[in-house]
UniProtKB/Swiss-Prot annotation:
This is Ribosomal RNA small subunit methyltransferase A. InterPro entries: KsgA/Erm, rRNA_Ade_diMease-like_C, rRNA_Ade_Mease_Trfase_CS, rRNA_Ade_methylase_Trfase_N, rRNA_adenine_dimethylase, SAM-dependent_MTases_sf. The gene is rsmA. Its main location: cytoplasm. Keywords: Cytoplasm, Methyltransferase, RNA-binding, rRNA processing, S-adenosyl-L-methionine, Transferase. It is found in: Cytoplasm.
Length: 267
């Protein structure tokens, strides 16, 4: 790279730049971008995935927080008519400004691990615009997203992601694929928003509240952890055993608890 455009990864931005050509190719094949599609890449870094995504002929918008990377990306992709760069924080990005039809946007990114969970929740609030998402994340985070009830990985992230999306843990990526190498293993996840929610809640914000309350003290029984929102009778009325711990409940049970709370608030 031209010395004028050299850039060191910044710890405060959680930057680890992907450089393994084999992994890059595998990710691009999983995304399977095509001409006529609209993609959004979050945190393009030095453009490892960007090059291949643009080569598909798809329209590509990228959001990059690091101001020092902006001239590097602008210089590298200046001749690409299907490239548009937004400098800013993806956590504050308004996806509606892209003007895409419902269920059409493909979102991709090697997400900074220090903001990956809040960023996923921000994206879920725009799930109606999104066709699919492919992310590089900390392996542990992907395992939590894809977890099922009954284990230690099942929690707020699993439930809220699976409420909105089908989750596929595609493959793992070792530290050597990055510069500098992170201290943890990574993984690629595919999230596909449901066309029809399998367990629609009356109020998804109440579902988030119920799930957060339940897992604040995950080792306690529901009867104890939920007492600020629902008493024992209300839990039973939702068809849920109050003596269970939160990790023993599936998504459908949490939706029933949230709906019980919604009914209680309207009474």
């Amino acid at each position: 790279m031209n010395e004028q455009y050299q850039h060191r990864a910044r710890k405060r931005f959680g930057q680890n730049f992907l450089h393994d050509a084999g992994i890059i190719d595998r990710i691009l094949r999983a995304i399977n971008a095509k001409a006529g599609e609209h993609l959004l890449e979050i945190g393009p870094g030095q453009g490892a995935l960007t090059e291949g995504l643009l080569g598909s002929g798809a329209q590509l918008d990228v959001v990059e927080l690091d101001k020092d990377l902006v001239p590097i990306l602008q210089h590298k992709f200046a001749d690409r008519s299907n490239f548009r760069l937004h400098q800013g924080d993806a956590l504050k990005f308004d996806f509606n400004q892209l003007g895409v039809p419902p269920r059409s946007l493909k979102v991709v990114g090697n997400l900074p691990y220090n903001i990956s969970t809040p960023l996923i929740f921000h994206l879920l609030s725009h799930a109606g615009l999104i066709r699919d998402m492919h992310f590089m994340l900390q392996k542990e985070v992907v395992e939590r997203m894809a977890a099922g009830p009954g284990g230690g990985d099942w929690g707020r992230l699993s439930i809220m992601v699976q409420y909105h999306c089908r989750v596929e843990h595609l493959f793992n990526v070792g530290p050597g694929a990055f510069n500098p190498p992170p201290k943890v293993d990574s993984a690629i996840v595919r999230l596909v928003p449901h066309e029809v929610l399998p367990f629609p809640a009356k109020d998804h914000l109440l579902l988030e509240r119920v799930v957060r309350e339940a897992f604040n003290q995950r080792r306690k029984t529901l009867r104890n952890t939920m007492k600020g929102l629902l008493d024992s009778a209300a839990i039973e009325a939702a068809g849920v055993d109050g003596s269970l711990r939160p990790e023993q409940l599936d998504l459908a049970a949490f939706v029933r608890l949230a709906d019980q709370l919604a009914d209680q608030q309207q009474a």
